[in-house]
């Protein structure tokens, strides 16, 4: 059964995931060809982009020790180090996908606003749609690359089908942990912006 699975799908997920990442970067290149607009708009967009990037780096620095503790705890538990490896790969894949999505979205935002002002809502909708689709492509593609790589490695290192399946479950745990904390942290960050904005305007 192992030989059949490896022979049929050992490289399929990896290749499919890499193709998805390629198309994500193609979309990013197409978006960047649109004008960013006036200097005032570009300045605001750069500030938003920088703030989002600093926030994500700070969040990942705080989240990294938590993920490391989770990996070590899993490795020392009966689940084993193969599951711990899957957790690490899942967390890394989720973090990369989130960063790429944030980076492309903040670059697309300013171009969407400029297109809405100069070219109408049709072009603005296209830019915003493609900018948002980069995140979806990266999530799906990183999932395929991560799981595909783990599946290929586990089928070479392990012979027990149940152990392979249970070890692969760690990928979802790692990816979900990063996604959950990023979602909660991002929500708190956004709420603080909304709270502080009236105060900043009054001052």
Segment roles from a protein language model:
Residues 2-6, 72-85, 145-170:
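Helix-interface capping motifs at the ends of transmembrane segments in multi-pass membrane proteins
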Residues 193, 198-203:
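Single conserved hydrophobic/aromatic residue that forms the stacking wall/gate
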Residues 36-39, 114-123:
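Juxtamembrane helix-boundary/capping and inter-helix hinge elements in multi-pass membrane proteins
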Residues 100-113, 186-190:
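Inner-leaflet juxtamembrane helices
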Residues 48, 112, 194:
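Residue-level signature of catalytic and energy-coupling elements of molecular machines
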Residues 4-97, 101-105, 127-137:
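N-terminal alpha-helical transmembrane segments of multi-pass membrane transport
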Residues 91-103, 136-144, 148, 175-184:
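Mid-bilayer segments of alpha-helical transmembrane spans in multi-pass integral membrane proteins
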Residues 12-13, 167-174:
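Loop-to-helix entry region at the N-terminal start of transmembrane alpha-helices
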